[in-house]
Amino acid sequence: MLVGVVYNHPQPLPYGEAKDKISEDAVLEEVSDVQQALRDLGHHVVLLPLKNDIAGFVQKLSSTPLDCVFNICEGAYGCGVHEMNLPALLELLRIPYTGSPPMALGCCLDKATAKRVLLGAGLPTPSFKVVQTRFEPVGPLPYPLIVKPSREDGGRGVSGESVVYDEAALKERIRYVLEKYRQPALVEGFIDGRELNVSLIGNDSPETLAISEVEFTKLPNGFPRILTYDGKWLEKSREYADTPVTCPASVDASLKRRLEEISKKAFQVLGCMGYARIDFRVDVKGEPYIIDVNPNPDISRKAGFAKSAEKSGLTYPQLIQRILNLAINRFSTFKPAEPVRIRKMEEEDVPSVLNLLDSINAFKRMEVAVAREVIEAYLKKPEGGDYSIYVADYLENQAAGYICLGPTPLTEGTYDIYWIAVNPRFQSQGVGKKLLRFAEQHVRSLGGRKIIIETSSKKEYEAARSLYVAHGFKEVARISSFYASGDDKIIYEKNLSN
């Protein structure tokens, strides 16, 4: 499979603490781990970082013949509120993707909205109040309370000062969140007890993995028993050392059953898909309360989710493949809007094919002119000539794609694919794959032994190269700076006898 790994390329943060950049940058480690696992599994991988050039990102995404996107994007422009927009885009482009849909991501990021959904489903979560201004009354919530940004994840904005015991400390912490994070503050009852994490994997009927626990026994007296941002991300900090995570957690059968039941229901009512992690606090009476639902948790090798999977019998590559399979199964209905038929090119197809070539930015005018000459030569002698040209049938009077191939001069059974192009409107719909499969079948029917494709090393041809590799072509030669300085000729080969 050709899998695109989409992630938010680290950007300057528009608000928050300077140290918050550490969690923003951590996505690169996650990308590396997922990419390596996919390659170890035999998949072809294209990295698709989301930077500030959104138009360029969309163009690359829509022009790459992806079988699936592995989505580990957590926002854009350094801001998590855009996390939900990426899967929304993928759905519009009809590209399968891993993880939760837009509504689940948006709902869970806004902690107050998620809590309202949970309460509406009869699930336990601490009492809360969303505070929009410094002077807004909190109401009758009993102390101690915990104050945190209402639309952040990764522990941003959470420190020892987040737990407050009186009105003065409450007002100061609300002021801090409003000014530093530029968003409403979530004030909720603080459950002074155990903190447990339940990881889930699945779609409509998720299963739970081994439960983890954040240990607080090493924290100094007087420090609130919470996992802070420093405890999550600053590996050299005292709080990181004092809050280790144990997996599997020591929980009795009754609590384990209760945690699993609540987690599965929360996963479903919030619309999560693929995988998620749910964080609990357990009070002195043994009652669990949901404090956070993360529909897009860190799945790097060293992260808690992967450790829970390992303790449940899944190796890291198996976990990644499982997540990928869930996405493929979920989006099995994503098909081209209309069936595509491949047939021989005819005279009336010329304007449509030339328009197709003109619409692809990677092709220069000179290249399009050469393609025109080849088409004219073919039409003069469509049978027994040097070229065979086929089109993928029309989409609203535009060819969905075309391919030009022919026997390589002075060889026996070797064929060249000279041109292959897909209408941008039909990219990522399997047209390129269908054209290549057709070409392979055609060459086999003629007794051909192998197919050669020559192409450029330029970035603009990356999608085409990925298509060739995904279809079984192997790079066998490269001529440095053949087309221009820095633009290599890459030669791909596929032996049909294998």
Model regions: which residues?
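Acetyl-CoA-dependent GNAT
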Residues: V340, K344-Y418, N423-R425, L436-F438, ...
